Amino acid sequence: MTVAQRERAALVATFRDVPPDAPTLCEGWDVRDLTAHLVVRERRLDAAPGILIPAFADYTERVQDQVSASTDWDVLLGRVADGPPLYSPFKLLDPIANVAEMFIHHEDVRRVGPGWEPRPLDEQTVSALRRPVAMMARMTLRKAPAKVVFRTPQGDTLATAGKGPEVAVVGDPGELLMFAAGRDEARVTIDGAADLVERVKKARGGL
């Protein structure tokens, strides 16, 4: 199995262990909503653009609501477990495009409420999570009021985004990815002027 496939399987296992109306870190979405999002992203090519393009967002939301309301929970989750269909561009892009998607949304369920801890990850998974950090940071922090530098505890710089005084975000690749994706539930340390750090946090365009 690829890292993306393992992360998908882990996500599905966690989603099966909670009720579909359980909360997530995605504001306004429960687990069923999040599952419908994953299905629409991979299986409804007509609606997927609205996930990233605001002009199409209303249509995407309507399709997602329809998919969520009309599909049995086990069937909905089964479609996520099955992965992208043959006609989906994600079939070929799965090893690249879905590592971050599956990791982030799995943690969106795991990290709700107090007491969460990062999952132990093998070296292959940690390595696979390094690459998406730069892409995510460019998407969410391109207008940041600071030069935001993402570093591992070992001193490797994985991404830089924004302009201005430096703010350093330090953590393991998965934690950096969660922070870049707009989640406050990330085990990172942030070095910079306190007011600037708060402005950087608010500047993130969460996905």
Where on the chain are the PLM-derived regions?
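C-terminal end-helix/capping segment
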Residues: 57-70
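An N-terminal domain-cap segment
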Residues: 1-50
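Structured surface interface patches that mediate subunit assembly and partner/cofactor docking
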Residues: 3, 17-21, 44-59, 75-207
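Generic alpha-helical scaffold signal
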Residues: 5, 25-28, 67-70, 96-99
